[in-house]
Swiss-Prot record:
One MF annotation (Gene Ontology) recorded for this entry: translation elongation factor activity
Keyword NAD included in the entry's annotation: no
Gene Ontology terms: cellular component: cytoplasm
Pathway, per record: Protein biosynthesis; polypeptide chain elongation
GO BP, one annotated term: peptide biosynthetic process
Protein name: Elongation factor P
Annotated localization: Cytoplasm
Species in which this protein is naturally found: Arthrobacter sp. (strain FB24)
Length: 187
């Protein structure tokens, strides 16, 4: 048992027989009244995101989660196959569990998988990844009233907005949390 004061991003709670992963949290201490913790959490099985508020100091049940490094091997239909880098065991993870991480995963990439009682809960990517742009229109200077961006397709098929000077076959750094362009990468 833990208290709401122990909540942080990535904590997995057991509430009403379900597992919930904390995405965001905020400890609030108003001038009047008791302190509380405002959270945004995702149901591990359904993917549903809800906002929930807890009173500060409330006892809550946390789930024991094992986080291990895995290497992404390949996609098998709607599922994804990963290899444990310590014992070389392979596990298959459903596309629903992988979620938006597919937008930033390449074969042989290292990821962190959270596992509870043998079941993969979610995938944690590094904060940023380097991917190559496979297609983007040429950037035209002029016809705009603000800083120019254009759509670009990454080698994973995901589309992001990049500055006008970025061209095809350019390696770029992308934020895996929101899919934003962070900069060009020199080889």
């Amino acid at each position: 048992m833990a208290t709401t004061n122990d909540i942080k991003n990535g904590t997995v709670l057991k509430l009403e027989g379900q597992l919930w992963n904390i995405i965001e949290f905020q400890h609030v201490k108003p001038g009047k009244g008791g302190a509380f913790v405002r959270t945004k959490m995702r149901n591990v099985m359904s993917g549903k995101v809800v906002d929930k508020t807890f009173n500060a100091g409330l006892k809550i049940e946390t789930a024991t989660v094992d986080r291990r490094d895995y290497q992404y091997l390949y996609q098998d239909g709607a599922d994804f196959v990963f290899m444990d880098t310590q014992d070389y065991d392979q596990i298959t993870v459903s596309g629903a569990t992988v979620g938006d991480a597919t937008n930033f995963m390449l074969e042989n990439q290292m990821v962190n998988i959270a596992i509870h009682e043998g079941t993969p809960l979610y995938i944690e990517l590094p904060p940023s990844v380097v991917l190559e742009i496979t297609y983007t229109e040429p950037g035209l200077q002029g016809d705009r009233s603000s800083a120019g961006t254009k759509p670009a397709t990454l080698e994973t098929g995901y589309e992001i907005q990049v500055p006008l000077f970025v061209e095809n076959n350019t390696k770029v750094k992308v934020d895996t949390r929101d899919g934003s362009y962070l900069g060009r990468v020199n080889d």
